[in-house]
């Protein structure tokens, strides 16, 4: 129904077919994806796209690359914040991402996105193919991020769990 395509258009990964994409009253319709990330928009796509040959730690560092000239102390602070959200990632910080379970990869994908310190976090089907206990852990983290002031745009098939943490549903 075009949900993923809409997220991709907001992210600058595909051209919008028509209309404008506004962020804080600024037209970002024709902006490049890296610029959109620098403006505070993060898109965590469906399918747990991690860098399999990089460690958990290296994946998190990669998430901060769009943040130009981020001081090393701030980079470490953001990594520690992700380890607080997902303690399991800290335990596996030197593990190659490709050897992790699907749930752990999803945690890493979300945490890597949060490394850019977004104002808007867009999540596309974060529970897809995951065990119920992992889904609960991920949604608890999403709720913490939302309560900390980050706007979350969530595309999710599991309506019951999504509605539990939502302010609005469409």
Label each region the model flagged.
Residues 1-170:
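Glycine-rich phosphate-binding loops of nucleotide-dependent enzymes
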């Amino acid at each position: 129904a075009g949900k993923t395509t809409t997220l991709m258009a907001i992210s600058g990964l595909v051209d919008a077919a028509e209309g404008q994409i506004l962020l804080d009253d600024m037209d970002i319709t024709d902006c490049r994806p890296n610029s959109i990330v620098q403006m505070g928009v993060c898109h965590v796509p469906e399918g747990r796209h991690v860098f399999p040959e990089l460690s958990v730690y290296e994946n998190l560092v990669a998430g901060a690359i769009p943040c130009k000239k981020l001081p090393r102390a701030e980079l470490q602070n953001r990594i520690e914040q992700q380890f607080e959200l997902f303690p399991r990632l800290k335990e596996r910080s030197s593990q190659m991402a490709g050897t992790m379970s699907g749930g752990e990869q999803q945690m890493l994908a979300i945490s890597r996105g949060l490394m850019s310190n977004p104002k808007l976090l867009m999540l596309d089907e974060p529970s897809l193919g995951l065990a119920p206990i992992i889904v609960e852990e991920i949604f608890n983290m999403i709720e913490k991020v939302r309560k900390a002031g980050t706007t979350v745009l969530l595309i999710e098939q599991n309506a019951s769990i999504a509605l539990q943490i939502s302010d609005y549903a469409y």
